[in-house]
Amino acid sequence: MAKHLYKTPIPSTRKGTIDRQVKSNPRNNLIHGRHRCGKGRNSRGIITARHRGGGHKRLYRKIDFRRNQKDISGRIVTIEYDPNRNAYICLIHYGDGEKGYILHPRGAIIGDTIVSGTKVPISMGNALPLTDMPLGTAIHNIEITRGRGGQLARAAGAVAKLIAKEGKSATLRLPSGEVRLVSQNCLATVGQVGNVGVNQKSLGRAGSKCWLGKRPVVRGVVMNPVDHPHGGGEGKAPIGRKKPTTPWGYPALGRRTRKRKKYSDSFILRRRK
């Protein structure tokens, strides 16, 4: 999608960008309210996830990650903004009268036709099992367990690659660089998720980030020693440690946070970068 730069003398929007080709008028039968629990706080009101809070009210869009309409062609009617994710979503009108949302594949435009099922064409936006895809296919919205819906490669610009098939398993290279095994019966969507340049978008002002529910981030080196291990000192002092740490004293860079002896370790052939 093309990004447009605000042309205004107002300082608050001088550097902001906006995508004018995306609508934001969801259908009433495909949305519902969603209670945002605490916004970074636990049941006692204590902050457990920093830099979260505030933000505009949101309505949840029901996304069809399972692609339930099998062997029924659908047409892309609109490309819409979703406040719950970085990727855009598409409203699909199916041949049997049903309507639903899917993630917007990169390059898809209004009027394109998509379909899901077995033995369907290998074209952008179509969903089919991994066993029916040739090696080297770029895919997204990948199932881990058959029938549970896509769980991998769903963020804006995400794309995975099918690199091998052996027995009942397929080998995928995920956006993180991880190489793992997935059952060949699992569904995946052909192509890359749209809105690739989301990380290049300029919000223009701090208030725009507050609307997204993101609070300011303060460096530990400017805090007091009681608040952060990097804090304290006279003037602009260094952190006073060999390596950076988290506010709780754990190593901040390079520390492995994945749970040991997890059931899915046997499916991971190479860890992420």
From Swiss-Prot:
Q: Which parts of the sequence are annotated with region: Disordered?
A: 1-20, 225-273
Check the UniProt entry and state the signal peptide residues, or none. Answer: none
The UniProt GO MF terms for this protein read: RNA binding; rRNA binding; structural constituent of ribosome; transferase activity
Query: By what name is this protein known?
Result: Large ribosomal subunit protein uL2cz/uL2cy
Family assignment? Answer: Belongs to the universal ribosomal protein uL2 family.
One Pfam annotation reads: Ribosomal_L2_C
- Cellular component GO terms, alphabetical: chloroplast; mitochondrial large ribosomal subunit; plastid
Question: Where in or outside the cell is it found?
Answer: Plastid, Chloroplast
Which branch of life, at top level? Eukaryota
The record describes its quaternary structure and partners as: Part of the 50S ribosomal subunit.
> Among its keywords, does the record have Chloroplast?
yes
Give the keywords, sorted: Chloroplast, Plastid, Ribonucleoprotein, Ribosomal protein
Biological source species: Oryza sativa subsp. japonica
Q: Is Ribonucleoprotein among the key words of this record?
A: yes
Which biological processes are named by the entry's GO terms? mitochondrial translation
> NCBIfam families given for it?
rplB_bact
Gene that encodes the chain: rpl2-A
